[in-house]
Swiss-Prot record:
Protein name per Swiss-Prot or TrEMBL: Ribosomal RNA small subunit methyltransferase F
E.C. no: 2.1.1.178
Biological role stated in the UniProt entry: Specifically methylates the cytosine at position 1407 (m5C1407) of 16S rRNA.
One Gene Ontology CC term in the entry: cytoplasm
Disulphide connectivity of cysteines: none
Pfam families from the UniProt entry: Methyltr_RsmB-F, Methyltr_RsmF_N, Methyltranf_PUA, YebU_pre-PUA_dom
Gene symbol of the encoding locus: rsmF
Length: 479
């Protein structure tokens, strides 16, 4: 694999020499940083099992090497990457996998370690959504996830990835993560804080990542991280699990932040060792039980993961002074709820008791029941999934609901050919050789729902959202 020139400040190299255990070679560290990063994917088990995914993609000649800490994770090598980007393959467009760096699969593995089954989880810094979607898959779309993102421009990307992966148990918020300790005290069974950091671990992906690096900047970032972990710890219920992670390598932003929390709340913080998280984890284990992953250890990005338990309640923060405002939705019950449920079922859309119907004007939504207790305490950007818009003749089912809820084996399902599916993703109407008998058609490809269509004569009218329409080379090259 080709080398690429990485910029290293002298002070950074000095710091790394001091931070690196004597069991590791500094020359190996430098060599690993100069190698381009191996690409990796995570199979979305909400859509397909790992076994079925491997069978489906076997004809493509992809080389898939298992990621040791994530059963659904694989490093991937392909011969046709230049002619067909991984993100344009049929399997990616239909949400069967997520392009995710192997190291970033570690925090969620830690969150669910030792049989942990949290019902209500917060992802404090969620965009672009790799870990939120991984959490949702581990929860099998049950319970609820509050996915927060401070950057307004990244909230849209977060929602797009959640929607593509068929996730229904997420509520989105757009706040500075430091507000949650006061706004939602002792609310969550588990919290992931993948903290904003100096990004020292990503030089294999971005050789210029350290151009603006300085010790002073790292200390400023660490101060923010302490405020974030303090807020997250307040929002965690006693007995709950907090995973703290970064994609950086210095101790100030990693071990020191966790040790500061333990010094601040000595009776309430317990470090949960991660040495048994996966075979070989002990190679990255610190004295405190954290994983400090230098890039040469597993040939991946540099990363840090710590797992903590809150063993006791701590004094609450002052209640926030803001007003959330009137909640614009009302629960949908009785005959109305029965009517839309029956209509949805008839169109191939189904959901369980963990999702509840809510209404705003002509919009009908499904909210995760586990999040309803938070309504009125915090303002949501988006809650659950939009199911439908009602109109005089019935309901207009929404694309995100189809992707999350549709049964691909329903009587109205119609399987497209490779060429027809490519036309669909380009936003064009489809003219199948044999038209379906139903007027409202659940369009599938590889037996995965990819949208709804109206049959008009021999034509299937495309309803694929305009903002998702693709051009350039698509996946017919996989034939």
């Amino acid at each position: 694999m080709a080398q690429h020139a990485v910029y290293f400040p002298d002070a950074f190299l000095t710091q790394m020499r001091e931070a690196m255990p004597s069991t590791l070679s500094f020359d190996d560290f430098l060599a690993a940083c100069q190698r381009p990063l191996r690409r990796s994917i995570r199979v979305n088990t909400l859509k397909i099992s790992v076994t079925d995914f491997l069978a489906l993609t076997a004809p493509y000649g992809w080389s898939l090497t298992p990621v040791p800490w994530c059963e659904e994770g694989f490093w991937i090598e392909r011969d046709d990457e230049e002619s067909l980007p991984l993100g344009s393959t049929a399997e990616h467009l239909s949400g069967l996998f997520y392009i995710q760096e192997a190291s970033s699969m570690l925090p969620v593995a830690a969150l669910f370690a030792e049989g942990n089954t949290p019902e209500r989880i917060m992802d404090v810094a969620a965009a672009p959504g790799s870990k939120t979607t991984q959490i949702a898959a581990r929860m099998n779309n049950q319970g609820a996830i509050l996915a927060n993102e401070f950057s307004a421009s990244r909230v849209k990307v977060l929602h797009a990835n959640i929607s593509r992966c068929g996730i229904s148990n997420v509520a989105l918020t757009h706040f500075d993560g430091r507000v949650f300790g006061a706004a939602l005290p002792e609310t969550f069974d588990a919290i992931l804080l993948d903290a904003p950091c100096s990004g020292e671990g990503v030089v294999r992906k971005d050789p210029d990542a350290l151009k603006n690096w300085s010790v002073e900047s790292n200390l400023d970032i660490a101060a923010t991280q302490r405020e974030l972990i303090d807020s997250a710890f307040h929002a965690l219920r006693p007995g709950g699990t907090l995973v703290y992670s970064t994609c950086t390598l210095n101790r100030e932003e990693n071990e020191s932040v966790c040790l500061w929390l333990k010094e601040t709340y000595p009776e309430a913080v317990e470090f949960l060792p991660l040495g048994d998280l996966f075979p070989g984890a002990e190679r990255a284990l610190t004295a405190e039980g954290f994983l400090h992953v230098f890039p040469q250890i597993y040939d991946c990005e540099g990363f840090f993961v710590a797992r903590l338990r809150k063993t006791a309640a701590i004094p609450p923060l002052p209640a926030p002074g803001y007003k959330v405002g009137k909640f614009p939705f009302a629960p949908m019950k009785g005959r109305e709820a029965t009517q839309i449920t029956q209509a949805a079922n008839a169109s191939g859309l189904q959901w369980g008791e963990n999702l509840h119907l809510w209404q705003r004007d002509k919009e009908v939504w499904l909210f995760p029941a586990e999040i309803e207790a938070l309504i009125g305490k915090v303002r949501f950007s988006r809650l659950g999934i939009k199911l439908a818009e009602s109109h005089n003749k019935g309901y207009r089912w929404q694309h995100e609901a189809v992707i999350a809820l549709a049964d691909p084996h329903h009587a109205n399902a119609f399987e497209l050919s490779h060429q027809e599916a490519e036309e669909w993703y380009r936003g064009r109407d489809v003219y199948p050789q044999t038209a379906p008998s139903a007027d409202d058609v659940l369009v599938t490809f590889q037996h995965q729902p990819i949208g709804l269509a109206k049959r008009i004569g021999s034509r299937l009218k495309n309803s694929y959202p305009r903002e998702l329409v693709r051009d350039g080379k698509l996946f017919t090259g996989n034939d």
